[in-house]
A protein has these predicted regions:
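Short, solvent-exposed loop/turn segments at secondary-structure junctions
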Residues: 2-4, 30-33, 117, 155-158, ...
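Alpha-helical packing segments of well-folded alpha/beta enzyme cores
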Residues: 3, 82, 86, 90, ...
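Short alpha-helical segments and helix-capping/turn motifs at coil-helix boundaries
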Residues: 5-13, 128-134, 220, 241-242
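Catalytic binding pocket for nucleotide-activated donors in carbohydrate/polymer assembly enzymes
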Residues: 14, 19, 27-65, 205-206, ...
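Extended, charge-enriched "interface" segments that sit outside catalytic cores
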Residues: 39-101, 105
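Glycine- and acidic
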Residues: 64-79, 99-117, 147-163, 184-193, ...
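Long, K/E/R/D-enriched contiguous segments that form extended
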Residues: 84-201, 373
Length: 378
């Protein structure tokens, strides 16, 4: 809906003014057969138990019937047990396929999507570096850190240099952090290669927190956020793409919102965005970028990430630095809720119950009725 409105108001405004009735919108959807029934059999069985029917597989709006069960502590505990079992399964899968030692008792925090500057994997990895620096400097005692496992998955276009640099940086940060005894058991980073549907079917059901942190106004819709919400992950995100509709349906109190709006982004562009101002004003952001620049993650070679750092400090077209403060601030809210497992899982269950709208079946019905002006075959 957000991007359809942007097309009407900005990109295709002249056409929209003349032919307003020719513009409509169909929100994406995902298939519950693959991404819940097949990928997450434990959750599927629990949903069927809670609803008393398996008809939800072909009528996903029936998930709404789970919402009253969020008040039932025993059902919420069953829901939490499903998530924990899925995390154990993913840990075993990651060890077998990649050699990763993932602790299923940590928060599994996932960011999987195409590698592009507007999707802002750089924002996530800079926040990880800042947390690492906090622990190393003693700013935060290791014992006070909530254990977190960060999982990235991405591919970049072959000629997209800055995206390739970002992938290399994430892997090098993972290498340093995962081998540092000072943060052992508190912070780990993994980048499984060749992200694909097979891996997704193991990772998505195991995820506690999903990252949807693109710059507001740049993501057309997205379907990853729908898959994660349907599988009981909480979302941290901006008001962009389908995040807007997910937040409306699951409730603002069940979504971790941060960052600038589209209007605020446009206003900052108009006044002249200077990323270096944010670098100089935020000691944690400065420390993180300086660690990238000084060779901490490139075996002491300061030239490896010169281009990436230069882009952050002089261009930063998608305002990673401007949203860094808001993004790191929301982490304390996330961790406070995660420290209350019953309440976290209650909200995660509410996400599942209110995500039925995001079925590909509903998308197809919308296309049939509003675009193609036809109906299903009898």
């Amino acid at each position: 809906e957000l991007h359809s409105q942007l097309l009407k108001d900005v990109t295709l405004k002249n056409f929209s003014d003349v032919y307003p009735d020719k513009f409509t919108n169909v929100t994406n959807g995902v298939t519950p057969r693959r991404f819940v029934k097949l990928a997450n059999p434990r959750l599927s069985d629990l949903i069927t138990e809670g609803l008393g029917t398996d008809k939800w597989v072909s009528d996903l709006e029936l998930l709404k019937g789970l919402e009253p069960l969020a008040a039932d502590d025993e059902f919420v505990k069953k829901f939490a047990a499903v998530k924990q079992a899925n995390k154990v399964d993913f840990s075993n899968y990651a060890k077998r396929e990649y050699g990763f030692d993932i602790d299923p008792n940590t928060m599994i925090n996932t960011m999987v999507k195409r590698l592009h500057e507007y999707k802002r994997q750089a924002l996530k990895i800079l926040a990880v570096i800042a947390r690492y620096a906090d622990i190393k400097s003693g700013r935060i005692a290791a014992d006070d850190v909530m254990p977190r496992t960060i999982v990235f998955g991405a591919k970049a276009a072959p000629g997209y240099y800055l995206a390739k640099q970002t992938i290399q940086l994430i892997n090098n940060v993972a290498r340093v952090i995962n081998n540092d005894p000072d943060v052992k058991g508190k912070l780990n980073v993994y980048f499984p290669w060749n992200y694909n549907v097979r891996l997704a079917q193991h990772l998505i059901p195991a995820t506690d927190l999903d990252e949807q942190i693109s710059q507001a106004g740049k993501e057309a819709s997205g379907t990853g956020n729908m898959k994660f919400a349907l599988n009981g992950a909480m979302t941290v995100g901006t008001l962009d793409g389908a995040n807007v509709e997910i937040r409306e349906r699951v409730g603002a109190e069940n979504f971790f919102l941060f960052g600038m709006t589209v209007d605020e982004v446009d206003a900052l562009y108009a006044e002249g965005y200077d990323p270096k101002k944010y670098y100089e004003a935020d000691p944690r952001l400065k420390a993180a970028i300086d660690m990238v620049a000084d060779g901490t993650f490139s075996n002491g070679d300061k030239t490896v990430y010169e281009d990436l750092v230069h882009d952050w400090l002089t261009k930063d077209w998608f305002m990673t630095l401007a949203d860094f403060g808001a993004y790191t601030a929301i982490q304390s809210e996330i961790e406070a809720l995660y420290a209350q497992p019953l309440e976290w899982n209650r909200k995660a269950l509410i996400n599942v119950a209110n995500s039925g709208y995001f079925s590909s079946d509903r998308s197809m019905e919308d296309y049939l009725e509003r675009i193609w002006m036809t109906g299903p075959l009898k």
